Structures are given as structure tokens and as C-alpha cells.
Amino acid sequence: SNSDIEEIIMEEQLIYIIMFFSIVLSALCSMLEATLLSTPLSYITGLEEQGVKGAARLKKLKQDADRPISAILCLNTIANTVGASIVGSLVYEVYGDALVGVFSTIFTLAILFFAEIIPKTIGTNYWRSLAIPASAIINGMIFITYPLVWVLEKFTKLISSRADQV
């Protein structure tokens, strides 16, 4: 019937919308991580001495990179995992068993190229122009993921302290 066709079209659109947003969020995370890790502390110190707005924020993130990296990796993992789960179930619902593997392969390759390789290349090559704006976005990510990052920090410290005893 007409309403069944409309529902299938809406579900197909939802598949592509979720894939798009999952890839965009993952790409942002990859670029921010590469930018933060590629920016030398000496460069940040120079910006701070010149009075560049945001340099102090960037320096704080760089000097204690565990928290920003944890926040970025949490969001990246959530984007990839939730995106893949929802897309997989929608593909199964709309197309059945036959195309789940095909969509999974396409989605995996799309994440690899558009959410990992390309954004990390951009972050490592354009860190000078990205570092200050990236620090503001990373601070937002830390705020959003703070409870999860806090638990991960405690867990990491527990593992680290036990490693010293071995």
C-alpha cells in the first residue's frame, strides 16, 4: 500500500541520515584528536606569549591530554557503535538479511576513509589553523562526556597504580 511505501522511503532516508551524522561526528573526533596531538607545546607557548585568545585553553588541554583524548574517544566510539547498530537494524528491517553485509562493508569503508584517514590527515597537516578552534570544541566534548571520562580516569589510575606494584 501507499503508506507502506512511504514508511520504507522514510526508513531508507533515516539510514542515510544516521550514516551521515555518525560519519560527521566521527570525522570531527578524528580531526580534533590529530590536531591536539600534532600541535607542539612550544608553538602553544608562543601563541600564549603573543596574547592569542584561546592559547591558554589549548595549553591546558595539551598539558593534560588524557582527559581531552578520553572525551574524544568516547564520542568517537559512541558515534561509530551506535551508528552501526542503528543502521544495521534499519537495513535488516527495510531490506532483510541479504543487504546487511553489503551495508556493513560500505559503512565500514566510509568510516575508514571519511571519518578516520581524511580527518586525521587534515588534523596533522593543518594543526596551526585548527588548534585554537579545536580547543573550544574539545572543551565542549569534555563537558558533555564528563561523567564517563571521570569514571575512565579513575579506572585508568587504578590500573596504572597496580602496574607500578607488579
What annotation goes with each model-predicted range?
Residues 2-166:
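Membrane-embedded alpha-helical segments of inner-membrane proteins
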